[in-house]
Amino acid sequence: MMTNLFSVFDPSAIFNFSLNWLSTFLGLLMIPSIYWLMPSRYNIMWNSILLTLHKEFKTLLGPSGHNGSTFIFISLFSLILFNNFMGLFPYIFTSTSHLTLTLSLALPLWLCFMLYGWINHTQHMFAHLVPQGTPAILMPFMVCIETISNIIRPGTLAVRLTANMIAGHLLLTLLGNTGPSMSYILVTFLLMAQIALLVLESAVAMIQSYVFAVLSTLYSSEVN
């Protein structure tokens, strides 16, 4: 029995080498195969998903978006989705359950958007601080509120993804720890519950990667 439920997220080392974060790059071994193997139905399905995302992100960015700007958000979606699914397999380090990775994705993106907006579209950024139709007496408060909400954006992006990944894994761990003390009949129901949870976790893995990419796209569209 584990003394701490969160120990399932602890990094481990082999021969004093920390190989945990290599799980983030496992996709590099699998993704290139689509370029030299005959395309299967999975490759065709994946390409259609990426094309749909490209069209949606292009719509969100609007006519002011630069050509090719959707590729960074599609790559972001692919990276997060792959790491979320990798974390569902046993004995594979869940990198997206750590703020180290999620903040490393959210903070530089947000910082680049802010620098680009304030340098190139200063008046447009100032106009965003006061919503249209705000009474004059409320303008100072609205500037403070909009500034705070803008500053916490990378934190909310990172914490949302991390919290969702942690919550599902904790539920699976809690159910798994109760297995040895159950009868054979109850273990059958436990396995069914864990399978249902894994299906839900797969849905969460897809939804959270999509939410992260869409919100990043919306933040980018605000600075144009």
UniProtKB/Swiss-Prot annotation:
What is the source species?
Drosophila melanogaster (Fruit fly)
Q: Which PANTHER family match?
A: ATP SYNTHASE SUBUNIT A
The identity of this protein, by name, is: ATP synthase subunit a
Subunit organization: F-type ATPases have 2 components, CF(1) - the catalytic core - and CF(0) - the membrane proton channel. CF(1) has five subunits: alpha(3), beta(3), gamma(1), delta(1), epsilon(1). CF(0) has three main subunits: a, b and c.
Q: What does this protein do?
A: Mitochondrial membrane ATP synthase (F(1)F(0) ATP synthase or Complex V) produces ATP from ADP in the presence of a proton gradient across the membrane which is generated by electron transport complexes of the respiratory chain. F-type ATPases consist of two structural domains, F(1) - containing the extramembraneous catalytic core and F(0) - containing the membrane proton channel, linked together by a central stalk and a peripheral stalk. During catalysis, ATP synthesis in the catalytic domain of F(1) is coupled via a rotary mechanism of the central stalk subunits to proton translocation.
Mention one GO molecular function: proton transmembrane transporter activity
Q: Does the keyword Protease apply?
A: no
Spell out the Gene3D superfamilies in the cross-references: ATP synthase, F0 complex, subunit A
Per the annotation, which location comes first and is thus the protein's main one?
mitochondrion
InterPro entries per UniProt: ATP_synth_F0_asu, ATP_synth_F0_asu_AS, ATP_synth_F0_asu_bact/mt, F0_ATP_A_sf
Q: Where in the cell is it found?
A: Mitochondrion inner membrane
Sorted alphabetically, the Gene Ontology BP terms of this entry are: determination of adult lifespan; locomotion; muscle cell cellular homeostasis; neuron cellular homeostasis; proton motive force-driven ATP synthesis
Q: Name one GO cellular component term.
A: mitochondrial inner membrane
Please give the family membership noted in the entry.
Belongs to the ATPase A chain family.
Arranged from A to Z, the UniProt key words for this protein are: ATP synthesis, CF(0), Hydrogen ion transport, Ion transport, Membrane, Mitochondrion, Mitochondrion inner membrane, Transmembrane, Transmembrane helix, Transport
